[in-house]
Regions:
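N-terminal beta1-alpha1-beta2 module of alpha/beta enzyme domains
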Residues: 1-69, 270
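Acidic (Asp/Glu)-rich catalytic clusters
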Residues: 62-70, 97-103, 179, 210-213
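A conserved active-site cap/scaffold subdomain adjacent to cofactor or substrate pockets
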Residues: 179-187, 191
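An alpha-helical appendage that flanks or caps ligand/catalytic pockets
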Residues: 2, 120, 126-154, 195-269
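Acidic-and-aromatic substrate-binding clefts and catalytic sites of carbohydrate-active enzymes
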Residues: 48-56, 82-87, 192-197, 226
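Flexible, glycine-rich active-site loops centered on histidine and acidic residues
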Residues: 2-20, 82-145, 185, 193
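Aromatic/hydrophobic pocket-lining residues that form the small-molecule binding cavity
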Residues: 23-27, 58, 89, 133, ...
Length: 271
């Protein structure tokens, strides 16, 4: 049996009593710790107009993390492609791959990573980005490909860098995109587990071998609490419970400390 590879996704949250600078320092501290204990990769999300998250400039955070680590793979989990021109994404990640060879991952999502009003501000007059996602993935593959596959517009220094692409998703739509291109598939089971089994099944059934992969490759995002005892794990998980409840009630509060009085605390989170 192959050894299970474990990685981490960081939304770069702000904890209660901290500011954005503290959150960025924590991001680096966590990356360095996970590198020491043998994690495979460390990905950073993309979120906009979120006062409790500092992950709006994902490419900059990926580069900053690469600069402060030595061996762990670092990437986006992911770049929300409808918000960005594929050419610029290729130039940015091609540059990082030049500076840090064989350490850069590029996870790609098709959601805006924010509310619709903010998405409109990001995209300006480009409102069909979600529907263009498959074509834009193809563009990125071309930009990272060999010189003889390029068109007039080239994403230097991305040409022939072959930065690994990962298709992210929380529904079955993304499974089709990944399968038809023979790309790795990453399912967001940490917030959308309902369609996880179906999406992975579709991906495996429709998978077409490519120069990248000869067989399907799946990564699953899960919420995991690690502790020495079940009691301690439940205590630590109370922070996540407070986050989830605040989100469902339209709040964007910093991550709260653990509590052994969870029911009482949750009752104070008003709509």
């Amino acid at each position: 049996m192959n050894k299970l590879k474990v990685s981490a996704l960081n939304l770069v949250p702000i904890r209660e009593g901290q500011d954005d600078s503290d959150a960025l320092n924590d991001m680096i501290d966590l990356a360095q710790h996970l590198e020491q204990v043998g994690y495979e990769r460390y990905w950073i999300a993309e979120h906009h107009n979120a006062p409790n998250l500092v992950s709006s400039a994902t490419a900059l955070l990926v580069q900053h993390t690469l600069e402060h680590t030595k061996t762990i793979k670092v990437g986006s989990g992911g770049i929300m492609l409808p918000n960005h021109a594929p050419l610029i994404v290729a130039e940015q990640f091609g540059t990082m791959a030049t500076l840090f060879p064989n350490r850069v991952d590029l996870g790609l999502g098709r959601a805006p990573g924010t509310d619709m009003m903010t998405a409109s501000a990001l995209r300006r007059d480009q409102h069909n980005g979600v529907y263009q996602f498959p074509d834009e993935v193809d563009q990125l593959q071309q930009y990272f490909g060999p010189a003889n596959q390029q068109s007039y517009v080239r994403a230097y220094p991305a040409v022939n860098k072959q930065v690994p692409l990962y298709i992210l998703g929380s529904s079955t739509d993304s499974a089709h995109v990944a399968a038809r291109r023979g790309l790795p598939y990453v399912f967001a089971g940490h917030f959308a587990p309902q369609q996880m089994k179906e999406a992975i099944q579709i991906y495996k059934e429709l998978f077409e071998p490519s120069e990248v992969l000869s067989e399907p490759y799946v990564i699953i995002g899960l919420n995991v609490i690690v502790a020495d005892t079940d009691e301690e794990a439940e205590y630590l998980a109370s922070s996540m419970a407070q986050v989830m409840v605040s989100i469902t009630r339209g709040k964007m509060q910093p991550v709260q400390p653990p509590t052994d009085k969870l029911d009482q605390v949750l009752s104070l989170i008003h709509i």
